[in-house]
Amino acid sequence: LKAAFFDTPGAARDVLRVGHMPVEPPGPGMVQVRIAVSGVNPSDVKTRGGLGARANPWPRTIPHQDGAGVIEQVGAGVDAGRVGQRVWLYECQLGRPHGTAAQWVTVPEGLAVPLPDGVSMETGASLGVPALTAWYCTAQVEAKPGRCVLVHGAVGAVGFYAAQMARLRGAEVLASVSNEGQARIAQAAGIETVPRGADLPAAARQWLTQRQREGFDAFIDLDFAGNLPVNLLLAENGAQIAAYASDTDLHPTLPVRDLMRRNVRLAFLLVYTMPPILKRQAIAQLTHWLKDGSLHHAQVHPYALHDIALAHEAVETRRHVGKVAVIPDGAPLG
């Protein structure tokens, strides 16, 4: 098979290569999937750069956790009826050296989730890490009717889904954007927006006042350290913060007394160690939303396999609003 890989961590252009590797046959409980689209996540880029949250001990790694494709072979114990099934994939490179940046990947069958009719391969490859993280965040902050939720990063991969999911759970949601272009994208998905930066507190206060509320019950945050001051300023007593990243500072000093005064509860989340029972619940709910068309999905920006270094750089520099993906050579259509 043709695949992209790296042998040592480093800059994308320095370490990513494309070449041929043996195809792994599916063993018991495994499926072999022909990859149509390979999704690129910030965590994939961090792993390749040696900055991942988990160790990557393999001598040669095919990157990327997420993707979508068609099951071509199954191992012993797997229903033969799954051959030909369209699936979306998640955590393919978790605890394994081979991810989805290849023409084929072989994974435990539970990581290949049926992709509902009418849902594109591009969308399927966009789920995985972002959608499961978003569901986890909305569950942790108990998004439901009567609660107001502020989502930081309305058009980020996680934030775009999190804002929608919180609304689908019945919460009232406000989400931050960096510019008018981002606001238009978010608003087209039914998300109310507020500008990031110095104007955010006043604009958010006005939004709360219109709802006769004094503060937010919950925050879903892509930068815990950077956004903590504004979150504290806008927090209702007993508010919850679900943080899935803190790139500006992984070792922040916490204003413990201020957090105590407002009885703020903190939840730090990593989808890769999310309890299996919650992951199953997330997949079931996500499948329901996919089938009934409740979710809007980010625009996909595709790169050819031989341009994978450019794809990784696009994620690192936030070149696009939407999802970066890699298309393996000879990828199946549909």
Protein language model annotation of sequence segments:
Residues 1, 294-299, 309-334:
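C-terminal capping/lid region of NAD(P)-dependent oxidoreductase domains
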Residues 22-40, 51-93:
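Glycine-rich beta-strand-centered segment in the early N-terminal region that forms part
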Residues 80, 89-153:
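NAD(P)H dinucleotide-binding glycine-rich loop of Rossmann-like/cofactor-binding domains
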Residues 88, 217-220:
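N-terminal Rossmann-like NAD(P) cofactor-binding module of classical short-chain dehydrogenase/reductase
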Residues 100-101, 177-185, 251-256:
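Short, glycine/polar-rich helix-capping loops at beta-to-alpha or helix-loop-helix junctions
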Residues 125-198:
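Mid-domain Rossmann-like dinucleotide-binding core that forms the NAD(H)/NADP(H) cofactor-binding site
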Residues 200-214:
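Short amphipathic alpha-helix with an adjacent loop that forms part of the alpha/beta core around
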Residues 226-294, 328-334:
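Glycine-rich phosphate-binding loop and adjacent beta-alpha segment
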